[in-house]
């Protein structure tokens, strides 16, 4: 290796030349999320938490609000401390107290890696971890930021500059961050993953149709989504009306909850779809519903890398998605599903009609999609990549043992 290359590869964030870390033993990781409500980020953190090799990693799983359905999956897992740092608001006095608690927790437990997921954990915990002397800090960004306010994007960019690594789950997010001025060499991409699905369900099973009061042979189209502006559900409803004009028996399920649920229900009624579209709210049996669906649609206006898309493909359901964010990284258009432009009900309806009227083509896409998930988006692969990233950073030039790191007097008071 040339001297210049050696210096470049062993120069830390403060400009000091260091040899790789000789850290041995288990790596202690503190992960922080907002809550345990079911969502893409929370599901991925749960998957990693359950999958990390306990002989090599000692996981601490922190949150800001100790609520959510995924807690039950973790309750049976032994030896995972789950501290809560309830700040209430970033601007409250409580935030200062919780910051001191977090800094003390990092030092008292000898944490090697602090890994935050999402806007508020990033803004709160990254600077605290840095000031507390955490050897490695990773900030995760899980979407393209279209839903964020300008000040939130600026704040997150400033905070993430303090991290050793910014972890994203799609190339599209990486490209967006680079355009916003993030340093490309600090960004790593590890895509979302799903567990293998039970594909034994049959469209002939009456369960979902009987439950909804529909004909046993009705074609069923599903949308799995949080109900907010960026999910494009209003365009799906317009497309559903067009589909219903040609396939009168078609029925539509919108599975999920959110702030605009009532508005969307009113929109469905205004379109004459009250008897064809059902908003189920939150469901814990998504797998069963998917097994009996003919088609899954993701009409988003913006995406990172959609768990709903992965889950649908893993279940062997043909998919249609908008060509935004990380969707083209999951769906190969015309091979493992169909991609359509966002905000285009006509194109979406045409794609839905194509797959509903050509079941052999839909089955071919479904088989290719489930194979793609098995090969590229397994939880085992994702966990292995996370473990490799942790090891790489701990062995890298930025690693400073916690005992040797300077600590701000503020956190010692």
Can you say where each PLM-predicted feature lies in the sequence?
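N-terminal strand-loop element at the rim of the active site
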Residues: 6, 20-27, 31-39, 43-97, ...
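A conserved mid-protein helix/loop that constitutes part of the nucleotide-sugar donor-binding site
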Residues: 42-50, 219-245, 252, 259-266, ...
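Short His-centered aromatic/hydrophobic patch
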Residues: 116-124, 141
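A conserved, positively charged/aromatic
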Residues: 138-167, 180
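A short, active-site helix/loop in glycosyltransferases that binds the activated sugar's phosphate group
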Residues: 163-189, 194-198
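Aromatic "clamp/platform" in nucleotide-sugar-dependent glycosyltransferases that forms part
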Residues: 282, 301
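Short hydrophobic beta-strand element within catalytic cores of glycosyltransferases
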Residues: 318-321, 331
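Conserved acidic donor-binding segment of nucleotide-sugar-dependent glycosyltransferases
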Residues: 333-334, 338-345, 354-359
